[in-house]
Amino acid sequence: MPGNSGAAPLPALEPHADLQALNTFGLPARADRLAIVEHPAQLAALLAQPDWAGAPRLVLGGGSNLVLTGDFHGLVLKVAIGGRRLVGDDDDAWYVEAGAGENWHDFVRWTLAQGWPGLENLSLIPGTVGAAPIQNIGAYGLEVAERFASLAVVSLETGASFRLEAADCRFGYRDSIFKHELAGRTLVTSVTFRLPKRWLPVIRYADVAEELAARGSVAPGPIDVSDAVIAIRRRKLPDPAAIGNVGSFFKNPVIDAATLGRLVAGHPDLPHYLQPDGSVKLAAGWLIDRCGWKGRDLGPVGVYERQALVLVNRGGATGTDVRRIAQAIRDDVSRRFGVDLEPEPVFV
């Protein structure tokens, strides 16, 4: 893993850089300058340059959780810090570190190939390792926070490097401190995961259980679970390389018991899931589908016909188009159910 010590040359700065290929929605936008950061020391050297002392900065990983609404007048930092290694173990877990620029899915499959299970439910999620804790990505009964040990970051304000433990990150549902107090103020350079030696499969979702059964997996191992999740995701979700999208566009809303009672009275078939804290999680895709949006377009952006949670670029869409259909969907769901949908991606 690249360290933070030693001299490193400044990364090349590309002026008036095209960002369309760097965001999975395929939205057109340009940046005043684009820097590809392959080593933490490059970042420190760049931040020391007076030309960029007060300039707006945007950290870009895989561009899979981003809606670009126009040109970015500042410096875009594309994270390309690589490397992955076992950094230690104890009686309970292996500790595995990866550079923030590593492809998330490739990293997950690599850990499984090494015999270090624990991330299999998060297979095929687009994006980079560094973005995973920022969003606290999750799928099929598991969140990154449950396998997280620590991360290394660089302050974009001072250039100082420091490490954050799990409690420091304030993880929540698709949430972390990086979306609040530290939003736009840091760049993650590496992440260390805690992968359990006493592994048990997480098969709480019916889709996963049914897929494993169809494959004849009576006592599934980690790779079996990963393969099942990959198959499910490929059936339900479009490949960003073929159809522009950012995966699930809306968070599943969390409500209280009183709101649930009101909703179930009018919609007895409403899917809902009780949470450990007594709150109730709803299926945003079901709400969107009931409002008639599944498979429907508004201009060049549409709701994917196989999964109502996903918005897709039908061709030539802009960030303004995405914002328009997202707001229209939110308005319809609010009018019909009295529930507010919150977008997952960040609008810039």
Curated annotation (Swiss-Prot):
Q: What class of enzyme is it?
A: oxidoreductase
Name the domain of life: Bacteria
- Which GO BP terms, alphabetically? cell division; cell wall organization; peptidoglycan biosynthetic process; regulation of cell shape
Q: What is its main location?
A: cytoplasm
- UniProt keyword list: Cell cycle, Cell division, Cell shape, Cell wall biogenesis/degradation, Cytoplasm, FAD, Flavoprotein, NADP, Oxidoreductase, Peptidoglycan synthesis
GO MF annotation: an example: UDP-N-acetylmuramate dehydrogenase activity
Q: In which pathway does it act?
A: Cell wall biogenesis; peptidoglycan biosynthesis
Return the Gene3D superfamilies for the record: 3.30.465.10, UDP-N-acetylenolpyruvoylglucosamine reductase, C-terminal domain, Uridine Diphospho-n-acetylenolpyruvylglucosamine Reductase, domain 2
Reaction(s) catalysed (UniProt annotation): UDP-N-acetyl-alpha-D-muramate + NADP(+) = UDP-N-acetyl-3-O-(1-carboxyvinyl)-alpha-D-glucosamine + NADPH + H(+)
**Cellular component aspect of the GO annotation:** cytosol
The places in or outside the cell where this protein is found are:
Cytoplasm
Cofactor dependence: FAD
Active site as annotated: 174, 248 (proton donor), 344
Report the EC code(s) recorded for this entry. Answer: 1.3.1.98
Domain called FAD-binding PCMH-type: residue spans: 27-198
Q: Which PROSITE patterns match?
A: FAD_PCMH
Please give the PANTHER family that the UniProt record associates with this protein. UDP-N-ACETYLENOLPYRUVOYLGLUCOSAMINE REDUCTASE (PTHR21071:SF4)
Classification via HAMAP family: MurB
What is the annotated role of this protein in its UniProt record?
Cell wall formation.
So what family is this one in? Answer: Belongs to the MurB family.
The name of this protein is UDP-N-acetylenolpyruvoylglucosamine reductase
Q: Which organism is it from?
A: Aromatoleum aromaticum (strain DSM 19018 / LMG 30748 / EbN1) (Azoarcus sp. (strain EbN1))
The record's gene field reads: murB
